[in-house]
A protein has these predicted regions:
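Preference for extracellular/luminal or secreted protein segments
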Residues: 1-317, 324-334
């Protein structure tokens, strides 16, 4: 506070605006954010004790801060790194059945955060300490007051993902580092993207040909809703020879049916359109009423993505398989 009072008010205001506008809303189930003022919150953080105390100093202007997670309406997990301490906060909140807001504070969101958070906010702002000092006592990321304003709606996140995010480290390692848009893509798609880049230096590479966790330019807004539509479910097929006898002659034809082998993994594909604003959903594959696989999909507004799911059905026979809102009958053979 003393430092802020000594600085030019216009610079402070501009910097705080930048902090808010560079924040990215990744997930917001049931419009949990912004939080309602006056609720009871528990905050856990992997930041320094000084930073955590700074948060606890400003949060009472917006909510009641409780020291026992069991007493909270909402748990806030401020993650400056993804370590055992961060996972402990998250797992404790889930075990307690609490609504959970995860703040990815100057770190990339990952699949674990997305899967466990009810709401996920990424804070990307960072600056050197005044005069370049490395002395303790300086918060060089998003200020506590802006942190609280973002959570409770006095400021709104307006940022977007500037580089697509991988689903896991193995996917990120497999990415061609000089190629955009290829997280999770197969080699054929990578060659297509490379050819497009070489055709024109200014060519815009598609951001939905791969299988990233989060697409380039993704960023949700408070109150804005996605509108997901499922289209064109593709399942494995088998071709069978059909021999027909008629009037003493034999004819051969072929029929293709949705079929695969028991216990052998197969891939289901579906197009997922988003006719609304940027948003996220969990696509479920359901066999005979039982969920057999799930996949998190974030889709930019007005865009589409191909959902690719590896499935296995062990029991031979005919089964009803649904992916999202689309359903087909699939035959499983020995």
């Amino acid at each position: 506070d003393t430092l802020m009072a000594a600085r030019n008010p216009e610079v402070v205001a501009m910097e705080r605006q930048l902090q808010a506008e560079s924040a990215i809303l990744i997930k917001n189930d049931d419009n949990l954010l912004p939080l309602s003022k006056g609720i009871k919150v528990y905050i856990g953080s992997t930041a320094s004790a000084m930073t955590l105390e700074a948060y606890k100093k400003v949060l009472p202007d917006f909510a009641t801060v409780v020291s026992d997670m069991e007493d909270a309406d909402v748990v806030i997990a401020d993650c400056t790194q993804m370590n055992d301490a961060a996972e402990l906060i998250i797992e404790d909140a889930k075990d307690a059945g609490k609504k959970l807001v995860i703040v990815a504070n100057h770190i990339d969101p990952n699949t674990y955060m997305v899967a466990n958070a009810d709401a996920l906010l990424a804070l990307t702002f960072s600056r050197p300490a005044d005069h370049g000092t490395g002395a303790s006592g300086f918060i060089t990321t998003t200020e506590p007051i802006v942190f609280a304003q973002l959570l409770f709606g006095d400021a709104e996140p307006a940022g977007m993902v500037v580089k697509e995010l991988a689903r896991d480290e193995a996917m990120d390692d497999a990415q061609w580092k000089d190629l955009a848009g290829d997280q999770g893509a197969n080699q054929y798609v990578r060659m297509m993207l490379l050819a497009m880049m070489k055709t024109s230096e200014n060519h815009t590479v598609p951001g939905n040909w791969g299988d990233p966790l989060i697409q380039y330019q993704y960023g949700m807004k408070y109150g804005a809703q996605p509108d997901f539509v499922y289209d064109t479910l593709v399942l494995p097929r088998a071709t069978h020879e059909v021999v027909t006898e008629s009037n003493g002659s034999t004819s051969t034809s072929y029929e293709s049916i949705v079929e695969t082998k028991a216990g052998v993994p197969f891939t289901a594909y579906v197009l997922l359109w988003n006719n609304g604003d940027d948003g996220m959903t969990t696509v479920q594959a359901v066999c005979d009423g039982e969920v057999i696989a799930e996949k998190i999909m974030a889709v930019n507004g007005g865009d589409w993505r191909v959902v690719e799911m590896e499935l296995t059905i062990d029991q031979p026979g005919e089964h009803t398989l649904a992916v999202g809102t689309l359903t087909k009958t699939i035959t499983i053979v020995e």
